[in-house]
Amino acid sequence: MTPDIAICDSTFCDSLPKSLIANSGIDAITHAIEAYVSVAQNDFTKMHSLQALELLFQNLSESYHTGTVVSRDAVHRGATIAGIAFSNSFLGVCHSLAHQVGSTFHIPHGSTNGILLPHIIMYNASRKPTRMGIFPSYKYPQSYERYSEIAEHIGADRSDPQGLVEKINNLMKDLSMPLSFKEANIPEKEYMSKVEAMAESAFDDQCTPANPRFPLVSELKHILIEAYDSP
């Protein structure tokens, strides 16, 4: 369902709990990053993704801590622009897995995405993926270069995928968000008992085909296991 209009009125968030500001912002960042590396990306979506990420990384922390009108307005615009990007290029396996973990353990969607995103970035950044995504708009794997472009654009300390991961983790810490599912207080035994089912369901999620690296179920299981106690 794609909206015809978006009402970007930051006063709607005046009484919003800070945790929702953080979760919504990280979800928007995930939207923009996944849209940028999607197999269906194009010049228009790349432009929107980068502008969204610039606005979000520059303003989300201030929006969370002090809630100024300027920062809230910028985050609203960034989230909307990210929506324009992913509604035209779709998302990837970060959202595929987040849908399963969130619905199984009832933790916020933004937190789930934020925990998974660093693992997905490093998984997708492989220069020799097991298999590329279906019908990509490019000839060779490009995820490493695209994550590096994002890292450089947002001023990460390193212009490579690891630099992007560090930038995301530092923002998550600043927003008092968990960096692993263990930190999100999900019981380990219960979590591990659901890993296989969650991986299988994520494989069939509508977001998976747009991921730049077409996953094996075993690889999705590995990502879920890794994300339990490792940021």
List the predicted regions and their residue ranges.
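A glycine/threonine-rich phosphate-anchoring loop and its flanking beta-alpha core
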Residues: 1-41, 127, 138, 142-149
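C-terminal and late-domain segments of enzyme folds
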Residues: 18-81, 85
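Short alpha-helical scaffolding segments that buttress acidic/His motifs in well-ordered protein cores
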Residues: 29-33, 75-83, 97, 117-121, ...
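Flexible, glycine/charged-enriched surface loops at secondary-structure junctions
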Residues: 40-48, 63-74, 89-94, 132, ...
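Glycine-rich phosphate/pyrophosphate-binding beta-alpha loops
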Residues: 80-113, 204-210
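Gly/Pro-rich interdomain helix-loop hinge
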Residues: 107-193
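Short, amphipathic C-terminal "tail helix"
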Residues: 190-231
